[in-house]
Swiss-Prot record:
Similarity field: Belongs to the LptE lipoprotein family.
Pfam families documented for this protein: LptE
Name used for this protein in its record: LPS-assembly lipoprotein LptE
One MF annotation (Gene Ontology) recorded for this entry: lipopolysaccharide binding
Domain of life per record: Bacteria
General function of this protein: Together with LptD, is involved in the assembly of lipopolysaccharide (LPS) at the surface of the outer membrane. Required for the proper assembly of LptD. Binds LPS and may serve as the LPS recognition site at the outer membrane.
Self-association state and partner proteins as the record states: Component of the lipopolysaccharide transport and assembly complex. Interacts with LptD. May interact with LptD during its assembly by the beta-barrel assembly machine (BAM). Directly contacts LptD at a wide range of positions, encompassing multiple surfaces of LptE. In one specific interaction, LptE contacts a predicted extracellular loop of LptD through the lumen of the beta-barrel. This specific interaction is required for proper folding of LptD and assembly of the complex. Also interacts with LptM, which promotes the efficient assembly of the LptDE translocon by the BAM complex.
Annotated segments matching region Disordered: 166-193
Subcellular location: Cell outer membrane
Membrane-protein topology: Lipid-anchor
Chain's gene name: lptE
Lipidation (S-diacylglycerol cysteine): 19
Range of residues in the leader sequence: 1-18
């Protein structure tokens, strides 16, 4: 019986490991990005904290921005904008529901390579009850905090695609340098009369 239980447990572990299953909210960050610099205009702001938390959850070691190492990729957080649009209205014309749209722009700088822009958009809606102003403000603050967390998750999920784009550009660069034959220098056919 013990042998059968061990066999079934081992089989379950192999199946989940073999199919690529991984824990929720974790991304397989490329090995070249396991050490990174997080650069932000507001290092203690909500987006910086959310991104720092997501990077640490995914096993990325963060270095100070002032580090002397220049061979480390850096994630530079850019502009964050939050727009609030009316989604529905009451009969009297007052806003009943808002849709909030958060747009986050960032760039990943890979030293000696290129700069890769990434962005994330998060949509949330919430009801506007004019009779509960304080509760509405608290709910909106909670929604904005959750939006920062979701935007950070989206940015971190895009890191593997940046690595793939970097590899693809390397392959294109090597194929163009090795496949094209050398052309002779251009000779002018006109005489300087």
């Amino acid at each position: 019986m013990r042998y059968l239980a061990t066999l079934l447990l081992s089989l379950a572990v192999l199946i989940t490991a073999g199919c690529g299953w991984h824990l929720r909210d974790t991304t397989q960050v490329p090995s070249t990005m396991k050490v990174m610099i997080l650069d932000s205009g507001d290092p203690n702001g909500p987006l910086s904290r959310a991104v720092r938390n997501q990077l640490r959850l995914n096993g990325v070691e963060l270095l100070d921005k002032e580090t002397t190492r220049k061979d480390v990729p850096s994630l530079r957080l850019g502009k964050v904008s939050i727009a609030k649009d009316t989604a529905s209205v009451f009969r009297n014309g007052q806003t009943a529901e808002y849709q909030m749209i958060m747009t986050v722009n960032a760039t990943v700088l890979i030293p000696g390579r290129d700069i890769y822009p990434i962005s994330a958009k998060v949509f949330r809606s919430f009801f506007d009850n004019p009779q509960m102003a304080l509760a509405k403000d608290n709910e909106q603050d909670m929604i904005v905090k959750e939006m920062y967390d979701r935007a950070a998750e989206q940015l971190i999920r895009k890191l593997p695609s940046i690595r793939a784009a970097d590899i693809r550009s390397d392959e294109e660069q090597t194929s163009t340098t090795t496949d094209t034959p050398a052309t002779p220098a251009r000779v002018s056919t006109t005489l300087g009369n």
